[in-house]
Amino acid sequence: MRFMQRSKDSLAKWLSAILPVVIVGLVGLFAVTVIRDYGRASEADRQALLEKGNVLIRALESGSRVGMGMRMHHVQQQALLEEMAGQPGVLWFAVTDAQGIIILHSDPDKVGRALYSPDEMQKLKPEENSRWRLLGKTETTPALEVYRLFQPMSAPWRHGMHNMPRCNGKAVPQVDAQQAIFIAVDASDLVATQSGEKRNTLIILFALATVLLASVLSFFWYRRYLRSRQLLQDEMKRKEKLVALGHLAAGVAHEIRNPLSSIKGLAKYFAERAPAGGEAHQLAQVMAKEADRLNRVVSELLELVKPTHLALQAVDLNTLINHSLQLVSQDANSREIQLRFTANDTLPEIQADPDRLTQVLLNLYLNAIQAIGQHGVISVTASESGAGVKISVTDSGKGIAADQLDAIFTPYFTTKAEGTGLGLAVVHNIVEQHGGTIQVASQEGKGSTFTLWLPVNITRKDPQG
């Protein structure tokens, strides 16, 4: 069963790592496809309008060419242009000179007026090949304008006209090579297609961005869930250990303490009756000391596993830290260890059990003193941190190996030849009961720093520590 659960967890971790990459790749590919295809439909509509405009222009040129051979008058050309302008989708038709003055127009009233100014004609630069532009709205209809030089006669025809015989004594009229022809066709469908393409592309890109964002957020949320679940599993394991220890401690306390009291009493009895300095006296003292040690182990075990009842009150941390340092000052001075702490007047009072916090600090100090041995420094700092306070205890001792850092708060884990291995477990338990956290940073040979975070109000807890 456990193997199957591990397999599922491994598969879930693998999928959580690979799926976001796959989704991002697919979204990127789809986005490139959408962007690449953008404008294809509108381009097809535009080409259809251009072709329509060019066909009508060529038709007018052909009609004019035939008319020249038949000596077509201006009025007849105007009529031909008006007839062609009546084709479906044609908004207007015009022929201008090089200065933009209208020579022919689908609206006869506009003949002789300026369609465009000379400057505008310079910018338009009509050429032999057709050009186009969108005019926006002509009255109420969006228009696409197709224009080029008006060429009713190709170059060979123009060259031949100079040598043509006169008809009835008159030459066939020649056309100004700089005349330009303009046709405006209805571009409503083109504009609608462009708007639809833009709207659809934006919708698709927005949907892709939403999918991408959701995938990224899901990835981080899932990773956060995995971390939270792992923390909960670790916490459950620790609680299970404490429950087991609780049952063990209850049995040990019941079965051992009464005999221990008898053993200690007998040891003192024999010590008092044995000659001072003799072997029997020393053995009796060793028995009494070991009985005390075993009784202390049982007491610490009970302290660890029994429910902690906090006597909460407003605590001035500056006062509490100074008091706790005084309790270990004699031991520290005997080892030539300096104790350093500077009061921080900006610290807020916190709701806590002062006796329990003093116990926490004393355990940390005693561990630091044992880690230093002789000649060193223990520094204590306190500062405000978010909705709580942070207390750091730093020593110049031998440090903790990296592979041991994760186990130092485990009951009965110790790196010392002497000790029960319950001190830091008790510290962790008390800090947790206060709604706080404790972390350790250490390098072997460079000392250690234990950092406590405690909320100002015990109902609040900093999840990040």
Swiss-Prot record:
GO terms for molecular function: ATP binding; phosphorelay sensor kinase activity; protein histidine kinase activity. Residues 1-14, 223-465 are cytoplasmic. It catalyses: ATP + protein L-histidine = ADP + protein N-phospho-L-histidine. Its EC number is 2.7.13.3. GO terms for cellular component: membrane; plasma membrane. It is a multi-pass membrane protein. It holds the Pfam family HisKA. Induction: Induced in response to high concentrations of Zn(2+) or Pb(2+). Expression of the zraSR operon is positively autoregulated by ZraR. Expression also requires the RNA polymerase sigma-54 factor. Keywords: ATP-binding, Cell inner membrane, Cell membrane, Kinase, Membrane, Nucleotide-binding, Phosphoprotein, Stress response, Transferase, Transmembrane, Transmembrane helix, Two-component regulatory system, Zinc. The chain crosses the membrane at residues 15-35, 202-222. InterPro entries: HATPase_C_sf (IPR036890), His_kinase_dom (IPR005467), HisK_dim/P_dom (IPR003661), HisK_dim/P_sf (IPR036097), Sensor-like_sf (IPR029151), Sig_transdc_His_kin-like_C (IPR004358). Contains one high-affinity Zn(2+) binding site per monomer. Part of the Zra signaling pathway, an envelope stress response (ESR) system composed of the periplasmic accessory protein ZraP, the histidine kinase ZraS and the transcriptional regulator ZraR. The ZraPSR system contributes to antibiotic resistance and is important for membrane integrity in the presence of membrane-targeting biocides. ZraS is a member of the two-component regulatory system ZraS/ZraR. Functions as a membrane-associated sensor kinase that phosphorylates ZraR in response to high concentrations of Zn(2+) or Pb(2+) in the medium. This is Sensor histidine kinase ZraS. It comes from Escherichia coli (strain K12).
